[in-house]
UniProtKB/Swiss-Prot annotation:
Protein name: Immunoglobulin heavy variable 3-33
Entry superkingdom: Eukaryota
Region (Framework-1): 20-44
Function: V region of the variable domain of immunoglobulin heavy chains that participates in the antigen recognition. Immunoglobulins, also known as antibodies, are membrane-bound or secreted glycoproteins produced by B lymphocytes. In the recognition phase of humoral immunity, the membrane-bound immunoglobulins serve as receptors which, upon binding of a specific antigen, trigger the clonal expansion and differentiation of B lymphocytes into immunoglobulins-secreting plasma cells.
Signal peptide (residue range): 1-19
Molecular function via GO: antigen binding
Stretch list, region Complementarity-determining-3: 116-117
Keywords, in A-Z order: Adaptive immunity, Cell membrane, Disulfide bond, Immunity, Immunoglobulin, Immunoglobulin domain, Membrane, Pyrrolidone carboxylic acid, Secreted, Signal
A matching Pfam family: V-set
Region (Framework-2): 53-69
Domain called Ig-like: residue spans: 20-117
Quaternary structure and interacting proteins, as annotated: Immunoglobulins are composed of two identical heavy chains and two identical light chains; disulfide-linked.
Organism: Homo sapiens
């Protein structure tokens, strides 16, 4: 019985570690078309510099749309056609932070933006 309880406790600890990963977005707002915004995503609970990072978005009443990805070291970046030339993804591994600079904003860019690992 004692052995079984130990395993349950170990599983609970491991699940707790997984739940400590946090990605907190900030910087959103309401702006007029043609203006700019910069989003930030503060990461914690994992080795940020070891992971490629993505931005995705969800427009009202629609599904998730991938926006951009940046490699773990910032060496490569890729964008959805809908934002290419207007949005720039970047990262600061010393600050564990991901960014999305959004220029020339359009009405169709209205969405909830999420960062993802």
């Amino acid at each position: 019985m004692e052995f079984g309880l130990s395993w349950v406790f170990l599983v609970a600890l491991l699940r707790g570690v997984q739940c400590q990963v946090q990605l907190v977005e900030s910087g959103g707002g309401v702006v007029q078309p043609g203006r700019s915004l910069r989003l930030s995503c503060a990461a914690s609970g994992f080795t940020f510099s070891s992971y490629g990072m993505h931005w995705v978005r969800q427009a009202p009443g629609k599904g998730l749309e991938w926006v951009a990805v940046i490699w773990y070291d910032g060496s490569n970046k890729y964008y959805a056609d809908s934002v290419k030339g207007r949005f720039t993804i970047s990262r600061d591994n010393s600050k564990n932070t991901l960014y999305l600079q959004m220029n020339s904003l359009r009405a169709e860019d209205t969405a909830v933006y999420y960062c993802a690992r």
